[in-house]
Regions:
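Secondary-structure end/capping motifs
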Residues: 246-317
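Bacterial N-terminal signal peptides that target proteins for export
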Residues: 1-11
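C-terminal motif of bacterial Sec signal peptides marking the signal peptidase cleavage site
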Residues: 18-22
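Pocket-lining segment of extracytoplasmic ligand-binding domains
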Residues: 97, 180-274
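Bacterial signal peptide processing site
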Residues: 24-26
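Short, solvent-exposed loop/beta-turn-alpha elements that line the ligand-binding surface or hinge
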Residues: 64, 119-129, 227-230, 296-303, ...
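A local structural motif
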Residues: 36-40, 63-74, 88-90, 173-187, ...
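Short, glycine-/small- and polar/acidic-enriched structural segments
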Residues: 33-170, 174
């Protein structure tokens, strides 16, 4: 069995001033459904880690907890965070980086449960490409062999000041390079794979299954920036805003119980999880099976979030540490 890992959380962008049209409705979430279940509206971004929330639906875990969970795809994590903070969504998917960016801007959110991440022994793997579903990839005939060689080069990302940029910048700094000398450009993943194959960019920051597509086209992985940055623990999170944490604490606790159960099931039943991941991402099953597989943590630990907070400040992506504490984690005692 493949070593399990998380699914990408790298679709985030750096700001919150984004359209919320993708959230599907401007009305506030409804409290209950016709069958007496409490309804929670949840924003996702259509990535492989969504398999766990789909498992919680299909296995009846949410229903067992008295919940009717309605999911909709938002444009990106910051848009989801803004929708959750305003009450348009009850919960939303977001990695720890956009969460910390939001907190630094005074947006109050809480982490309710883990959505994806790394196992505690992930860094001990002999091949980090089996652990990390993000990758920095150069073209087939590129002379570049190290992230250190990318000064003055052009690297594509799905968004600026977001997870892939942060993790690649961190890897470059550790290698003795200067991330400020990189020419970052924004390309969606499909365009990035094509541009890399055509030699129009020097490297691309990608996420599975696009990493596999780039390698199939002759690309070469020179860095696994995600695992090197996060090391272990939850990366993607299910977040709730002030309104939901105040108005629906019991429902959020129920959601956490159900999703933790689904996360544990997904880790033990990878075939089912991969099948759902293929459907969620509209990707051929064989491509998903040949990509690194998601790891779904069953807890959110403050220590893991603090490492990210400190790193963002050290890299200059935050003016200073947010100085988070246990109150960030919903239900923490």
């Amino acid at each position: 069995m493949k070593t399990l890992i998380r699914s990408l959380t790298a679709l985030a962008v750096g700001g919150l001033a984004l359209s919320l049209a993708a959230c599907g409705s401007s009305s506030a979430p409804q409290a209950s459904s016709a069958d007496g279940l409490s309804t929670l509206k949840v924003g996702t971004i259509g990535i492989t880690s969504d398999a766990a929330i789909e498992l919680a639906k299909s296995k009846g875990y949410f229903k067992e907890e008295g919940l009717n969970v309605e999911t909709s795809v938002v444009a990106n994590p910051p848009a989801g965070v803004a929708a959750a903070q305003s009450g348009q969504l009850d919960l939303t998917y977001a990695p720890s980086i956009p969460m910390l960016n939001a907190l630094a801007q005074g947006v109050n959110v809480k982490a309710v449960a883990a959505a994806d991440g790394y196992s505690d022994d992930a860094m001990g793997a002999s091949d980090l490409t089996l652990i990390d579903d993000t990758a920095l990839i150069v073209g087939k005939d590129s002379p570049i062999t190290s992230v250190r060689d990318l000064e003055g080069k052009t690297i594509s990302l799905p968004a600026r000041k977001a997870q892939l940029e942060v993790t690649i910048a961190s890897a470059m700094k550790k290698a003795g390079g200067d991330p400020a000398k990189i020419n970052w450009i924004v390309l969606d993943f499909n365009s990035a794979v094509q541009s890399l194959a055509q030699g129009r960019i020097d490297a691309a920051g990608l996420v599975a299954p696009f990493t596999s597509k780039a390698v199939e086209a002759g690309g070469k992985v020179i860095s696994s920036p995600g695992i090197e940055f996060f090391e272990k623990g939850a990366v993607g999170l299910w977040l709730a805003g002030d309104k939901t944490t105040s108005d629906k604490p019991e429902q959020l606790q129920a959601f956490a119980r159900a999703i933790n159960k689904a996360n544990a099931y997904a880790n033990e039943h990878t075939d089912e999880a991969q099948d759902l991941a293929a459907k969620v991402t509209d990707t051929p099953l064989d491509v998903v099976q040949n990509s690194t597989m998601t790891y779904w943590p069953t807890e959110v630990r403050l220590e893991d979030l603090k490492r990210v907070d400190q790193a963002l400040a050290e890299l200059g992506y935050l003016d200073k540490e947010v100085n988070i504490d246990d109150s960030l984690i919903f239900g923490a005692k």
